[in-house]
From Swiss-Prot:
It comes from Volvox carteri (Green alga). This is Oxygen-evolving enhancer protein 1, chloroplastic. GO terms for cellular component: chloroplast thylakoid membrane; photosystem II oxygen evolving complex. The keyword Plastid applies. Residues 1-53 form a transit peptide. The gene is PSBO. It is found in: Plastid, Chloroplast thylakoid membrane.
Length: 293
């Protein structure tokens, strides 16, 4: 996903991170809805890695030091802290600088063999380094019994992304966790979120048809304007869909209020304004945030 080059900025030597999965993890099976996902609860989250920058190190860089390096597409890492989640006191926290960095995109595809099961296949990322969600805010409630509630409220919480399947088909989707509302424990916060339409209602297709503007039907086929097989092409839909995600806290620093972990989400792809069924996209990666009361 990232160029294999070393970036030196503000005295920090940073190797680009093609994969930040050199993390010691404990696997934990989790199910949401019709999709089954495996989420990893990291016992040591990339902390202290030479391949990552902390929040303070990122803030110390100038525009020219960041430009063209891919650093802007990464989340800070937690260098110091504890993996003992019980150190996080019970209470309601404001979550700021909430950042989510994907490290893997897979798409659910049918088996090429008759009667085979569907599975998530690896993809090639076609989008440039602009798919990380950042500057988000929300709330985190921690109960005295170990329960936790996480809500996302605002920020840069969506990013248009495209991946390519092994056969060459490209799948576009709006990577997001908009209005995520999850409950569970700190190492397993499960919930749903809203997936807005990839295209807006004013977008026109190649035949000039749109949701709130443009033609009602294909001009070249006036006699078949009301044909049932063309209905989904003529009547555009910008209806929001639903996705599910699991967040796992791996490390906390009660002195600085920083928190970090891993996540996994499953969401629908673009539907071409309702003209085609969506594909399931599985995204896994890292997240970071800062807590205050």
């Amino acid at each position: 996903m990232r160029a294999a080059q070393t970036v030196k900025a503000a005295g920090v030597s940073r190797a680009a991170r093609p994969v930040r999965a050199n993390v010691v993890c404990k696997a934990q099976k989790v199910e949401f809805g019709q999709a089954a996902a495996a989420v990893v609860a990291a016992s040591a989250l990339v902390a202290g890695s030479a391949n990552a920058l902390t929040y303070d190190e990122l803030q110390g860089l100038t525009y020219l030091q960041v430009k063209g390096t891919g650093i802007a597409n990464t989340c800070p890492v937690l260098e110091k802290g504890s993996t003992d989640l019980s150190e996080l006191s019970a209470g309601t926290y404001k979550l700021e600088n909430f950042c989510i960095e994907p490290t893997s995109f897979t798409v659910k595809e049918e088996s090429v063999f008759k009667g085979g099961e569907t599975e998530f296949v690896k993809t090639k990322l076609m989008t440039r380094l602009t798919y990380t969600l950042d500057a988000m805010s929300g709330t985190l409630k921690v109960g005295s019994d170990g329960s936790a509630e996480l809500k996302e409220e605002d920020g840069i919480d969506y990013a248009a992304t495209t991946v390519q399947l092994p056969g060459g088909e490209r799948v576009a989707f709006l990577f997001t966790i908009k209005q995520f509302d999850g409950k569970g424990t700190l190492d397993n916060i499960k919930g749903d979120f809203v997936v807005p339409s990839y295209r807006g209602s004013s977008f026109l297709d190649p035949k000039g048809r749109g949701g709130s503007t443009g033609y009602d039907n294909a001009v070249a086929l006036p006699a078949r304007a009301d044909a049932e097989e063309l209905l989904k092409e003529n009547v555009k839909s910008t209806k929001a869909l639903k996705g599910s995600a699991v967040f796992s806290v791996a490390k906390v620093n009660t002195a600085t209020g920083e928190i970090a972990g891993v996540f996994e989400s499953i969401q629908p792809s673009d539907t071409d304004l309702g003209a085609k069924p969506p594909k399931d996209i599985k995204i896994t990666g890292l997240w970071y945030g800062q807590l205050s009361q």
